[in-house]
């Protein structure tokens, strides 16, 4: 009975999170002529799902026809995607993140394939609650990206995201 109640509670929480989520809904994709900086084609969303491991992740959504450099970038002169977690009382957030595997793409401006991210990219955020820490916390993030299309790259941007976390839900 306890498992059924717990499963129902988790499902209700996840449905509520989806209903209140800031997850992306495709609207119209920008065109190259409309773009003046990378933040116009890359959006950052945070997700807290207490039943996953880790329970937190950051999702970058890149508009169709664009890409961002992977981490690590293919060459030192390329600007790699970089996530910098901020501080939150009662939570230790690792600054050593594991970035997803890139897609290797060939572009007219490069002699060799480049490591890039396209579409949706999920970056797990490992965290450790401090002993005895309870309640709600919010972790701020800065995400450095440089968006490119098949012909050129746009000025880099630093995106921000906030990740609300319920420490009590993680410990259940």
Listing of model-derived features with the role each one plays in the protein:
Residues 19-172:
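Extracellular/lumen-exposed scaffold segments
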Residues 14-17:
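C-terminal motif of bacterial Sec signal peptides marking the signal peptidase cleavage site
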Residues 1-2, 19:
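N-terminal hydrophobic targeting signals that begin at the initiator methionine
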Residues 2-8:
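Sec-dependent signal peptide recognition
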């Amino acid at each position: 009975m306890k498992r059924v109640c717990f499963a129902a509670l988790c499902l209700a929480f996840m449905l509520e999170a989806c209903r209140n989520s800031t997850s992306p809904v495709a609207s119209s994709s920008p065109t190259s002529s409309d773009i003046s900086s990378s933040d116009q084609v890359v959006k950052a969303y945070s997700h807290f799902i207490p039943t996953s491991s880790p329970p937190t992740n950051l999702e970058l959504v890149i508009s169709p026809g664009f890409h961002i450099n992977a981490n690590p970038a293919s060459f030192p002169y390329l600007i790699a995607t970089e996530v910098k977690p901020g501080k939150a009382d009662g939570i230790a957030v690792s600054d050593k993140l594991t970035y997803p595997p890139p897609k290797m793409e060939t572009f007219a401006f490069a002699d060799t394939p480049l490591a890039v991210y396209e579409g949706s990219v999920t970056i797990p955020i490992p965290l450790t609650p401090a002993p005895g820490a309870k309640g709600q916390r919010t972790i701020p993030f800065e995400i450095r990206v440089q968006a490119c299309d098949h012909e050129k790259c746009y000025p880099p941007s630093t995106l921000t995201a906030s990740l609300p976390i319920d420490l009590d839900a993680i410990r259940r």
